[in-house]
């Protein structure tokens, strides 16, 4: 058997798979947390008015005021959601740029930089 029959190969680099899985999990978690309804249940068993509203029919009149957040901040308001989206995109762009600027050792043995 000749020496050329057995070549050593580097193990498969699965780092990018784990990065994609981690970023996907983070994006799904952020989307879930920003889109879930944390408002208290307001109304009765037939009429649900979580954002405050008025309902009137022939026998019943309901008037619920909207929830007062006061000094509390809500993740559901559009300013915070937009800020979170911009921050997340900025971090993703920065992270992908840092990962792409690493020096990679090529199969030819040369150290190539992607600058």
Swiss-Prot record:
What Gene Ontology terms describe where this protein resides (cellular component)? host cell endoplasmic reticulum membrane; membrane
The lineage's top-level taxon is Viruses
Q: Which residues cross the membrane?
A: 14-34, 75-95
| Ranges facing Cytoplasmic side | 1-13, 96-115
Where mainly found? Answer: host cell
Q: Which Pfam families match?
A: Plant_vir_prot
The alphabetized UniProt keywords are: Host endoplasmic reticulum, Host membrane, Membrane, Transmembrane, Transmembrane helix, Transport, Viral movement protein
Q: Which GO terms describe its biological process?
A: transport of virus in host, cell to cell
Where it sits in the cell: the answer is:
Host endoplasmic reticulum membrane
Q: Could you list which ranges are Lumenal topological domains?
A: 35-74
More about this protein = TGBp1, TGBp2 and TGBp3 seem to act together for cell-to-cell propagation. TGBp1 is the main movement protein that physically cross the plasmodesma with the viral genome. TGBp2 and TGBp3 would facilitate TGBp1 function.
Q: Which family does it belong to?
A: Belongs to the Tymovirales TGBp2 protein family.
Protein role? Plays a role in viral cell-to-cell propagation, by facilitating genome transport to neighboring plant cells through plasmosdesmata,.
Q: What is this protein called?
A: Movement protein TGB2
